[in-house]
């Protein structure tokens, strides 16, 4: 979320059209993904929402404005209201990587940028990396582009998968990154991965057994989950450790990072874990 004072031009235009008390409620924060703007609006601004969106679009130079909503469902679909424009497909460039997506239907969090940048540095060219929840290539494209590693990207949702394939071509990594449109639990590979990405935060623990079956002995798993602050730092490591033990594995925690606040009192975290067969 970008925070700053309202652009003087926005205030200048809308102060002539909105009551003074509503001008004070104009959003000072927004998210820009490519040339699409995600704009939070207070309920009091509802009667003017389309005009407000139009002015923000003109001043900030975007083609489409969506009202921020909630993320829901197994595949983390956003629920946004279209306020201005019509085309919600865009190309967002970050750290030299092109991410094409439909912002209205596919989640992309600029707040996770540090983790995407970090992924560009973790893998070696001789590694095989399996991304179990690839999305549009959020985490695995940096590995393929900068780490030069071989990547298998698995994405269940057909619409999101279409953009994943496009992004592989856009970033010219077809020679080392392949994509599979399936539930990762149906992926046939076993004991193949040097590194596994589990960039998912809805019941991620349910996918640990599949990750273990894909992993080589000594593989590194980047395990994402959400955890109440009061349970940190014991969780989510203890749950991961318990499940790996049930399947005959030991685990070593190499690193733990906070990604962002997910909800009041809840953090999105990532653990870097090395797993060994007992």
Curated annotation (Swiss-Prot):
GO BP terms, alphabetized: tRNA methylation; tRNA modification
Top-level taxonomic group: Archaea
Keyword tags: Cytoplasm, S-adenosyl-L-methionine, Transferase, tRNA processing
EC number of this enzyme: 2.5.1.114
Record field: catalytic activity: 4-demethylwyosine(37) in tRNA(Phe) + S-adenosyl-L-methionine = 4-demethyl-7-[(3S)-3-amino-3-carboxypropyl]wyosine(37) in tRNA(Phe) + S-methyl-5'-thioadenosine + H(+)
Effect of residue 116 to A: Loss of activity
Effect of mutating residue 142 to A: Decrease in activity
One function term, GO molecular function aspect: tRNA methyltransferase activity
Pfam families linked: TRM5-TYW2_MTfase, TYW2_N_2
Gene Ontology CC entries for this record: cytoplasm
Protein's cellular compartments: Cytoplasm
Outcome recorded upon mutating residue 155 to A: Loss of activity
Effect of residue 107 to A: Decrease in activity
Variant or mutagenesis effect after changing residue 76 to A: Loss of activity
Residues involved in S-adenosyl-L-methionine binding: 109, 116, 155, 183-184
Family statement: Belongs to the class I-like SAM-binding methyltransferase superfamily. TRM5/TYW2 family.
Annotated function: S-adenosyl-L-methionine-dependent transferase that acts as a component of the wyosine derivatives biosynthesis pathway. Catalyzes the transfer of the alpha-amino-alpha-carboxypropyl (acp) group from S-adenosyl-L-methionine to 4-demethylwyosine (imG-14), forming 7-aminocarboxypropyl-demethylwyosine (wybutosine-86) at position 37 of tRNA(Phe).
Protein name: tRNA(Phe) (4-demethylwyosine(37)-C(7)) aminocarboxypropyltransferase
